[in-house]
Regions:
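Alpha-helix capping/helix-boundary segments
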Residues: 23-24, 54, 126-127
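PIN/NYN-family metal-dependent endoribonuclease catalytic core
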Residues: 19, 31, 35-65
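Hydrophobic/aromatic ligand-binding patch that stacks against planar heteroaromatic rings
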Residues: 40, 111, 129
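Active-site neighborhoods of divalent-metal-dependent phosphate/nucleic-acid chemistry enzymes
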Residues: 83-120, 125
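Acidic, PIN/NYN-like endoribonuclease modules and their adjacent C-terminal/linker elements
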Residues: 1-4, 114-121, 125-146
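Metal-dependent nucleic-acid phosphoesterase active-site entry motif
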Residues: 1-32
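Domain-scale selection of a single, long terminal region
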Residues: 56-92
Length: 146
């Protein structure tokens, strides 16, 4: 998958976007840039994708940091499940994940590859600094500018 492939398919409206946990948290808790990027990602002609690790991580973080917001998170997830594709994280490691410093983030990249996503939507500095070009790693603000 090259940048030219992505650009051509983006023009045709065929863009698969894996939404990382940090974007989901910000989308649930506010209505700023991450929320607007989430809405764009789940809106046709895009296909939004979550992996099972994102959902588990989201639930753990809300239980630990935002227990009073768990009902809002659960409601958000119920609505999200109607608009996204949920994928499992493959067990088989891929060579590209060595470029991700945080070992805990590597399964997210694995899921992105398995789901053949065009964009990984994240605010995670490890992904943003990785130098990966496939999938394209974008912040919510960058994604909104497309």
């Amino acid at each position: 998958m090259s940048w030219h492939w992505w650009k051509r398919n983006a023009a045709e409206g065929i863009v698969r976007i894996l939404i990382d946990t940090n974007v989901l948290i910000s989308a649930i808790l506010g209505h700023g840039t991450p929320y607007r990027a989430y809405v764009k990602a789940v809106t046709y002609p895009h296909t939004a994708i979550l992996c099972d690790q994102n959902v588990s991580e989201l639930q753990r973080i809300f239980a630990r940091k935002f227990p009073q917001k768990i009902p809002a998170m659960e409601h958000f997830l119920q609505l999200t499940y109607e608009a996204i594709e949920l994928v499992a994280v493959p067990e088989q490691m891929i060579p590209a994940e060595q470029q991700i410093r945080d070992v805990a983030d590597r399964p997210i990249l694995r899921a992105a590859y398995a789901a053949k996503v065009d964009v990984l939507l994240t605010g995670d500095k490890d992904f943003l600094a990785s130098g990966l070009t496939t999938p394209r790693i974008l912040t919510p603000a960058e994604f909104l500018r497309l």
